[in-house]
Amino acid sequence: MDNEIKLFEGNQIRSAWDSEREEWYFSIVDIVAVLTGSNNPRDYWYRVKKRMTEEEKSELSTFCRQLKLKAPDGKMRETDAADMQGIFRIIQSIPSPKAEPFKMWLAEVGKERLDEIIDPELTIDRAFIKSAGV
């Protein structure tokens, strides 16, 4: 998996591209932080997860995975992550005025990767820009 940092309104969202499944996975805690503005997004996610399991009878294992993503301290740590479908389910459980702009941002992230699959030259350009620090 290729780990990347994506930016939504200046906030970092840790992500990973699974080339076998050809889909993005995003750190759920990062998304919760962006949507809620919570000082403790890990605890907020714990409560949402508990509510989803109890009230909605959701099997989180069907759309949540533990992935090693780079933590703020620079170390690779396991964190809950979900693909786009899972993220949309989670967004529905979090009341936030940022939900709609975030959904549009997710769609753009997905479109960028599809464009790169269709035109591999875009991947090379993106890697060049990234290595040049632009």
Label each region the model flagged.
Residues M1-V134:
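An anion-engaging/catalytic patch
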